[in-house]
Each structure stands twice: as structure tokens, then as C-alpha cells.
């Protein structure tokens, strides 16, 4: 579990530094799950994205630029750049899985950087958004590869659990979620195809059944894109909160050393109020506040000004 720092400066007796902290995950959820899909497969566009959207989820799709056709008729097994942009416009993360899917640990320094850069440029040109996360082909990486891939990014997938194929029966998938809830962890699921590909399902309804299982636990689990969870957890770990007394409440000033453009994210502040209602403002705007048990959960900008809580 990550921690953030709260510093008191003459606080009132009503709210102490111990009462104020940054939640480990968005909205104070207990853990996080990211659903990721490799290799630009056509049914990511035709099946996976629509099934995620039916449940209010968004996924991360790792694209191999060299495999993506300009028009659908040229390749029926991979989605097009136009379809990728459509998925992005619907809220999914479309990110970098190298240009041609090589073993990155076997490349020269020049070829390594070219595989990353060429796909970054293609993604920006076709999607209109930069790739800020990375997925290693064949899950093969070393320290040099990680360093090259992480330049200008918030995260890379270094560990995953199987979403598809014989490696992921129902009991296995449910166990991954149970363990994440118990440990307060962020986990990332990985698969390629549903109906075709080396790790496809014998019965694709196993995938939608798992989505339904996640939906049933949504009050406890944050199902977020890889980029969103990576940015949130990095900023939550880095930020400090300075708590000072204010009229009828406190002022909480956030400070973080991370780049506000690359790591753009809202955070959730947990305030122990013993069940009392509060109002929160930042930079002249009212902030969203929700309640659960004895806590208030305040959505705030870690790159913004002081938060006043009354």
C-alpha cells in the first residue's frame, strides 16, 4: 500500500493530519484492475471494446503499428488506424507495443529506440494523442529496455495475469481479484484474441462472465486503464499534503514534484469526518465529495492550489 505525507501546522481539533490522506486508489477503492489487450487484433474493436463499454469499463489496447492495415479489407485480423482512433475517442487507451513486435532484448541500441519512436510517431499521427505507457513484446525486457521504453511515460506493463486461454479458468481469474482485494494491489490482466490467437478462449463467454464478476465488485475495485492507474498511483505516492487551520475547517495544500502534463490526473483525498458532511473547494470551484462509512472522499487536483474543507 502506498502512503502520502500530511504535515500539520497548528491544526484545529476537528481535523488532524491523521484524518487527511490521499486514497491509494480513485474514490477510495480497495484495489485496481486494468484490462489490457495485445497486438491490435480486430476483435478488440468488434467485440472487446463494446463489451467493456456495456459495463462502463475502458481498456488498454497495445498496438503494433506494422500490423495495422490502412483499410479493413486489407487485413481482417487486425483493426485499422481509423478504428483505433474511434476506440480512443470512446475513452479507451491506445498505446505502444513497438512497431514490429521484436524481441527487444536482442536489438541494437539504435533499433531498440527506432522500434519505440516509430510507433510513438504513428500513434500520435493517427490517434492524435501521445502514448504514455508501454508493453513489451513477448514480455521480454531487461534494465536497458525498460529505461528506453520508460522515457516520457508514466508506466510500463512489467507484470500481468492471464485473461485468456487455458491458463485462466474461472477459479484462477476470481483468485487474482480476491488476492488484489486482500493486499490492496493493482493488477493488470493480459490477453490477445477471444476467438483466435494462441491464447484465445475455448469459450469466449468466459471473458464476458469475468467482466460481469468485476462489475459486481465495482464498489470495491477501480477498473481503470493502465495509464490512468499508473498516473494516479505515481502521483499519490509522490504528493505531500500540508494541513493548516482555516475558518470552520482546514486548508490542505498539495505539492508534487511530477510533471503536471505527463501525469495529469485527479486524486482522491480521504477525510475522516466521523460521519459529518463537509464542503470542499479548490481554485474557486466546488469539489465533488462522496461519503462512505465515517469518511468523506474529495476529488481534487494535486497540481492545483490549496483545498479548503469546511
Question: What do the predicted segments below correspond to?
Answer:
Residues 109-114, 170, 204, 208:
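Non-membrane alpha-helical structural segments and their capping/turn regions in soluble enzymes
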Residues 1-8:
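Bacterial N-terminal signal peptides
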Residues 148-151, 159, 166-181:
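Surface-exposed substrate-engagement region within the catalytic domains
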Residues 11-35, 43-47, 76-79, 220-236, ...:
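N-terminal pre-catalytic segment of deacetylase/amide-hydrolase enzymes
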Residues 292-310:
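C-terminal beta-strand-rich structural cap/linker in extracellular carbohydrate-active enzymes
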Residues 31-33, 53-155, 159-164, 188-196:
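Metal-dependent polysaccharide deacetylase catalytic core of the NodB/CE4 family, i.e.
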Residues 17-27, 53, 59, 63, ...:
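C-terminal domain-boundary segment and adjacent tail
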